[in-house]
UniProtKB/Swiss-Prot annotation:
SUPFAM superfamilies membership: Bet v1-like, GTPase activation domain, GAP, SAM/Pointed domain
Disordered: annotated segments: 146-203, 318-350, 405-459, 512-574
Modified residues (Phosphoserine): 112, 115, 155, 343
Organism: Bos taurus (Bovine)
Entry comment, domain topic: The SAM domain mediates interaction with EF1A1, and functions as an autoinhibitory regulator of RhoGAP Activity. The polybasic cluster is required for activation and mediates binding to phosphatidylinositol-4,5-bisphosphate (PI(4,5)P(2)) containing membranes.
Protein name according to UniProt: Rho GTPase-activating protein 7
Disulfide-bonded cysteines: none
Region of interest: Focal adhesion-targeting (FAT): 296-468
Keyword tags: Cell junction, Cytoplasm, GTPase activation, Membrane, Phosphoprotein, Tumor suppressor
Biased composition range(s): Low complexity: 320-348, 409-423
Example of a GO cellular component annotation carried by this entry: focal adhesion
Length: 1112
């Protein structure tokens, strides 16, 4: 008998339980870790999507509407390049993966009430933000000129609806499924069409959207009529697609849908009802349509047109009309902004090509209209006849032989006749009918306005390379460009004599008695050069005077006078913004770096706040795409985000510091400019007198003298006299200023990014990468960087004398600008620093970073003119970018803002007065107090309409009566506005209303700020109060002198409070151009408070002088 087999030896039950429990815990821990990491990635991906201009996808994920179809996202952003698309899709794929894992993140919330980071801004123009519901909704559009072949009518493909991005997205809102339908034509760009009977709503709103090509919902006239029933037969309305798709889902998916339903019902409680309603577009062209339908659709038979015409898809017919409006942009969006001038502005260029309004704008140009070409040809013929080729040119009597004349005349012009005047030194001509921009208290020596009309014989050329002559005559008047033209033949003349430009400029500077005046009101040419100024510009393939090297302008200018009025305040803290502050006038620096006409609209300092917001998001997208493509995997991740400027951290007290160690933001809040005046004067001294010093910024100065200069800057911040100082001492002091800043000029957050660009990004990609990184800098850092780079480019222009190339300068200045040693000490542990010190030599990483900093600064100095321009790629997203350029309205357009059709601008002004007193009656309810170092009360109020700008209010007590304060505001602006360059009343509308233009100075080389406002005042108010109201307006008689500012709202309310004192309340909401929304949040309120303080101090200073006079 065989023995039975023995069972194998088994472990004890306790060991088995222990091992299985350990394995289960490992699995649970791994799943928990993976889930936590996925949640972190999802949160950072949503933050990046909002910062890079894709907030709609972050909203969809938070609403549990993921996963989405990546291919539809690519089609929606077809204007982006491949790298940017990959960066976007990488985040969306991460969210799709997290959605499959059923991960949820908390809804996005602001960190604080001071932050305006949630301002809606999307790169794509196919999404719109509903301000009432705080939701993003998609504007579904057709492409009538689809490259795909249309299906045969009646075929199954002809009635298919657009497929949903995913099956889960089909069940967006079960409670509202009976109201959602999306109707598309056969010409829609749809690549993933579902089978017949499947419905795919792509919107979360309960609306029926049928959009036509190239239009936005509610912005086009094509939506005013409904299609006929026969036309509607080509569309399929399927309301039960949700139910059919839901039946095919598994049990788990049904549970998910139930959670969506609960979430949707939860959101509906906080969600405002949609106001879009039923919107149906015009009929969509399809195959087999008859002649009757074509007439009904107002279609144009393209095949019957002339062969010379160009078939351009999505071109809407617009009438070509001439206008005298000025514009800061060289092109306009096809979709006009709601607040822009109602009629399309079309400007044509004549053969002269030199007139101020002679730019060629193709907006509204209809390529299918043959009469357009006939009109243009006829106008060209008239231009040729008006400028005969045998025109005789005259030169002035005091012309110096061997130099090019600064003024030329033709015909029978006589310099001493026709009641005209010629400024031979500046090249400007004041003919009959000249309008001058002159302050109210102008001297009688200035020219009077003439009433006769100008003729062709009075036309002269105005040169942009003559220092000191902007649009002003020798008497300080502003030229009337609308009544003056420039000879077209001068283009050809300049083409042959462009080599003599430098000689002319040096000669003019030598004999010029104008120089840089410290007072704009006493200056012959008070307004600095601006990119909007008209100047002589030759053809695109020729060199322009503004594009010449900076050495083409004279660098020798007289020093600022040192006789500064004695200060009567402490000179620190809030007293830093007193009305007797001295401001630097640096005209030659501004004129030498003035952009050419064809690049004016691309300058960053000309963009509106909404455009800057969109440009910053696009820059983050571009920078992320480049760094993720070229840097190592451990050098990037989801940590890319826009720098957060409103962190809740304890801000150090800088009351005991004035210059060194003070952040740039504090300088802006104190003085309105990011660089202290004494530092600007040091740069001017080096530029005017020390560029010939060999080894400038390389040779060291004397420490004792440098310390004395530092103390001089701290004690006298308004005006430091550097006369007789050593160039090397001043240069070393300038390096120490940037070294002592609390953070590097490129900021702590972005300094490493700048270094990575020059370590990993290829050379041909570095320019666009560095431009994107610069756009992520705070405004004050970017402005100072631009000023410094332009200054250093002037230093390198004199390389033959000082032997300082861009690389040599970079070696000397890179450690101070990047704070390389400081960053290493802060980012390294004490053990690592001790090991490096013991070795006695830097490691390879430090060497690479130093080399990258040197190469980067040298590259930025050489390419400084290209770094501060809008990228050309922004033109691809034209509809979403150009429509953000909010321009001032005309008087007629202001009247149309009222609900009454017969209203004019007077009704608009009366509404403004009523709204002001409504605020006073409600005691400014809803305003939030804001701390400031100024001796004034500051508060703000958020406004939902218009650009992302707050309404600020500053209140102070002034020792004067309301009538005196109103007079000071209207007639004596130069007594309290230290930045004022010139002012002029353009037109008097009535006894209390006028069009007023004034120009304010900016930190060189940035252009001046040009204001054209409609202002009205009231004196017969209750309790003896007075009010002054201002709003920017577009006026054809106001020439553009600088960057045109858009004042949305400005109000002065003056209330008596007894004892000869008054309470001044100033409210302002303005777009100064070239600033991000964060700048207005951080700094603009302080500037408003500083303004009322300067108004008060103008009376205090006057009373003090009166008492001193009486005591004598």
């Amino acid at each position: 008998m065989a023995r039975p087999l023995r069972a194998p030896l088994r472990r004890s039950f306790s060991d088995h339980i222990r091992d299985s429990t350990a394995r289960a815990l490992d699995v649970i821990w791994k799943n928990t870790r993976d889930r936590r990491l996925a949640e972190i990635e999802a949160k950072e991906a949503c933050d990046w999507l909002r910062a890079a201009g894709f907030p709609q996808y972050a909203q969809l994920y938070e609403d549990l509407l993921f996963p989405i179809d990546i291919s539809s996202v690519k089609r929606e952003h077809d204007f982006l390049d491949r790298d940017a698309i990959e960066a976007l899709c990488r985040r969306l794929n991460t969210l799709n993966k997290c959605a499959v894992m059923k991960l949820e993140i908390s809804p996005h919330r602001k960190r604080s009430e001071d932050s305006d980071e949630d301002e809606p801004c999307a790169i794509s123009g196919k999404w719109t933000f509903q301000r009432d519901s705080k939701r993003w909704s998609r504007l579904e559009e057709f492409d009538v000129f689809s490259p795909k072949q249309d299906p045969i009518p009646g075929s199954p493909d002809a009635v298919h609806l657009k497929s949903a991005p995913s099956h889960e997205n089909m069940q967006t809102d079960l409670s509202d499924r009976q109201e959602v339908a999306s109707v598309h034509s056969t010409g829609s760009l749809t690549t993933h069409a579902p089978q017949r009977g499947e419905a795919a709503p792509a919107r979360t709103n309960s609306v029926l959207s049928v959009c036509s090509s190239g239009t936005f919902v509610g912005n086009d006239d094509s939506f005013c009529s409904l299609p006929s029933p026969k036309e509607l037969s080509s569309f399929s309305f399927s309301m039960k697609g949700h139910e059919k798709a839901a039946k095919s889902k598994t049990h788990s998916l049904l549970k998910r849908m139930e959670s969506l339903k609960l979430k949707g019902s939860h959101h509906s409680k906080h969600k405002a009802p949609s106001k879009l309603g039923l919107i149906i577009s015009g009929p969509i062209l399809q195959e087999g349509v008859d002649e009757e339908k074509l007439k009904q659709l107002n279609c144009v038979e393209i095949s019957a047109l002339n062969g010379n015409h160009i078939n351009v898809p999505m071109v809407r017919k617009r009438s070509i009309s001439s206008s005298t409006q000025t514009s800061s942009s060289s092109s306009q969006s096809e979709t006009s902004s709601n607040v822009s001038t109602p009629s399309p502005v079309t400007r044509t260029r004549s053969l002269s090509a030199c007139n101020k309004r002679g730019g060629m704008y193709l907006e509204g140009f209809d390529p299918f209209n043959q009469s357009t070409f006939n009109n243009v040809m006829e106008q060209n013929c008239k231009n040729r006849e008006s400028y005969p080729e045998d025109t005789v040119f005259y030169i002035p009597e005091d012309h110096k032989p061997g130099t090019f004349p600064k003024a030329l005349s033709n015909g029978s012009f006589s310099p001493s006749g026709n009641n005209s005047s010629v400024n031979w030194r500046t090249g400007s001509f004041h003919g009959p009918g000249h309008i001058s921009l002159r302050r109210e208290n102008s001297s009688p020596k200035e020219l009077k306005r003439r009433n006769s009309s100008s003729s062709v014989s009075s036309r002269l050329s105005i040169y942009d390379n003559v220092p000191g002559s902007i649009l002003y005559s020798s008497s300080g008047d502003l030229a009337d460009l609308e009544n003056e033209d420039i000879f077209p033949e001068l283009d050809d003349i300049l083409y042959h004599v462009k080599g003599m430009q430098r000689i002319v400029n040096q000669w003019s500077e030598k004999f010029s008695d104008e120089g840089d005046s410290d007072s704009a009101l006493d200056s012959v040419s008070p307004c600095p050069s601006s990119p909007k100024q008209i100047h002589l510009d030759v053809d695109n393939d020729r060199a322009t005077p503004s594009d010449l090297d900076s050495t083409g302008n004279s660098l020798n200018e007289p020093e600022e006078p040192s006789d500064i009025p004695e200060r009567r305040d402490s000179g620190v803290g809030a007293s830093l913004t007193r009305s007797n502050r001295h401001r630097l006038r640096w005209h030659s620096f501004q004129s030498s770096h003035r952009p050419s006409l064809n690049s004016v609209s691309l300058q960053i300092n000309c963009q509106s706040v909404a455009q800057m917001n969109l440009l910053q998001k696009y820059s983050l997208l571009k920078l992320t795409a480049l760094l993720e493509k070229y840097t190592p995997s451990n050098k990037h991740g989801f940590s890319w985000a826009v720098p957060k400027f409103m962190k809740r951290i304890k801000v150090p007290d800088y009351k005991d510091r004035n210059v060194f160690g003070v952040p740039l933001t504090v300088n802006v809040q104190r003085t309105g400019q990011p660089l202290p005046q004494s530092i600007q004067q040091a740069m001017r001294y080096l530029r005017n007198h020390c560029l010939d010093q060999v080894g400038l910024f390389r040779k060291s100065g004397v420490k004792s003298r440098i310390q004395a200069l530092r103390q001089m800057n701290e004690s006298t911040i308004d005006c430091v006299n550097y006369e007789g100082q050593s160039a090397y001492d001043v240069a070393d002091m300038l390096k120490q200023y940037f070294r002592d800043l609390p953070e590097p000029l490129m900021t702590n957050k972005l300094s490493e990014t700048f270094l990575q660009i020059y370590q990993y990004v290829p050379k041909d990609q570095r320019l666009q990468a560095i431009k994107a990184a610069i756009m992520l800098l705070p405004d004050e850092n970017r402005e100072v960087l631009q000023t410094l780079l332009y200054f250093l480019s002037d230093v390198t222009a004199a390389v033959k004398e000082n032997q300082m190339t861009p690389t040599n300068l970079a070696v000397c200045l890179a450690p101070s600008l990047f704070h390389l040693n400081t960053l290493k000490r802060e980012n390294s542990s004490p053990r690592v620093m001790q090991r490096k010190q013991s070795l006695g030599k830097p490691d390879q990483k430090d060497l690479n970073e130093n080399l990258a900093a040197t190469q980067g600064l040298a590259h930025m100095i050489a390419e400084c003119k290209k770094l501060f321009q809008v990228p050309e790629e922004m033109s691809r997203c034209r509809n979403s970018y150009t429509e953000q350029e909010l321009k001032p309205l005309t008087l007629e357009a202001l009247g149309r803002l009222c609900n009454d059709d017969s209203a004019d601008y007077q009704h608009f002004l009366q509404d403004c007065v009523d709204s002001l007193f409504k605020e006073v009656k409600e005691k400014f309810k809803g305003w939030v107090s804001y701390s400031t170092s100024e001796q004034a009360e500051l508060s703000y109020k958020k406004v939902s309409e218009g650009p992302p700008l707050r309404l600020w209010r500053a209140t102070i007590e002034v020792p004067a009566t309301p009538e005196e304060i109103l007079k000071r505001l209207l007639k004596e602006q130069h007594l309290w506005d230290v930045d004022l360059l010139d002012s002029k009343v353009i037109e008097i509308l009535d006894s209390q209303t006028e069009i007023y233009q004034y120009v304010q100075n900016s930190m060189a080389p940035h252009p001046a700020r040009d204001y054209v406002v409609l202002r009205t005042w009231r004196t017969n108010l209750p309790k003896g109060a007075c009010a002054l109201l201002l709003t920017s307006v577009d006026h054809d008689r106001a020439p553009v002198v600088g960057v045109r500012v858009n004042v949305l709202l400005a109000r002065y309310l003056i209330e008596p409070c007894g004892s000869g004192k008054s309470k001044l309340t100033y409210m302002c909401r303005a777009d100064l151009r070239g600033h991000m929304p964060e700048w207005y949040t951080k700094s603009f309120g302080h500037l408003c408070a500083a303004e009322v303080v300067k108004i008060r101090d103008s009376f205090s200073h006057q009373n003090t002088e009166t008492k001193d006079t009486k005591s004598r």
